[in-house]
Design a protein with these regions (language model features):
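Low-complexity repeat regions of mature extracellularly deployed or surface/particle-associated proteins
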Residues: 23-235
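Bacterial N-terminal signal peptides that target proteins for export
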Residues: 1-10
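N-terminal signal peptide c-region/cleavage motif recognized by signal peptidases
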Residues: 17-18
Length: 235
């Protein structure tokens, strides 16, 4: 069974969207602007589901733009995908994918966000995570939590921000982990970028780069396993 749901909202007031789709091969497309104080909750079960269009990274057909928003996405099954843009300040997002060969690619927009948080939890093998924030502008005070359990997973995070905190936990073999954080850091009295990571498993690759105009940056990295290659650059 295949279902396609499209929400097109161009509004100035509260929007609440709740959707539960079962059976697999379901698609959800959302184009929502000026969505301050909105709540969006989507649950998909089965295989082959998608939020946004996985074939179009430039125009993924999933856009939520506003402030003080709450986003919850849950996918349970295999070969599911989430692709889109979640843009705004003081907003929270919770993403859960359970199953193998699932993909997650989310962009916080060119101008980023302020004082928000995102929690991503993935369980299964051969999963990918790509998170890009504020490619052309500076943001601040963002919290990103990522937990992945399973084998052959890939994580890529690119952020332009100050005071951004990443908490990433990977459990499994053959993991590849890359994080780049740019933008103005804190002052001598205020921490700048912070990454806390625990990677458990064999043959892991970790690459962390943190830049900024002032110090300090903080990295707490715990790697347990064999054949691990780690590269850390801080400026």
């Amino acid at each position: 069974m295949k279902k396609t749901i499209r929400f097109f909202a161009f509004i100035m007031s509260l929007l609440f969207v709740a959707s539960v789709l079962a059976g697999g091969n379901n698609s959800v497309y959302i184009d929502q602007t000026n969505a301050d104080n909105s709540t969006v909750s989507i649950t998909q079960t089965g295989s082959g589901n998608q939020v946004g269009d996985r074939t179009s990274l430039l125009q993924p057909a999933f856009l939520i733009d506003g402030n003080a928003m709450n986003l919850t996405l849950v996918q349970d099954g295999m070969n599911n995908s989430i692709v889109g843009n979640f843009i705004g300040g003081d907003s929270t997002a919770s993403i859960t994918q359970t199953g193998s060969t699932n993909s997650f690619s989310l962009t916080q927009g060119n101008f980023g966000t302020n004082a928000g948080s995102m929690t991503v939890t993935k369980t299964g093998d051969n999963n990918t995570v790509t998170f890009t924030m504020a490619s052309t502008a500076d943001t601040s005070n963002y919290l990103y939590n990522l937990t992945i359990s399973g084998n052959h997973n890939t994580v890529t995070s690119t952020m332009n921000s100050k005071y951004i905190e990443n908490n990433i936990t990977l459990t499994g073999n053959y993991n590849s982990y890359t994080t780049v954080q740019n933008g103005a850091n804190g002052t001598a009295n205020t921490p700048g970028h912070k990454i806390t990571s625990a990677i458990i498993g064999n043959s892991n690759t970790v690459s962390i780069t943190q830049n900024g105009t002032t110090t300090p940056n903080i990295i707490n990295l715990n790697v347990t396993g064999n054949n691990t290659s780690t590269t850390i650059v801080q400026h």
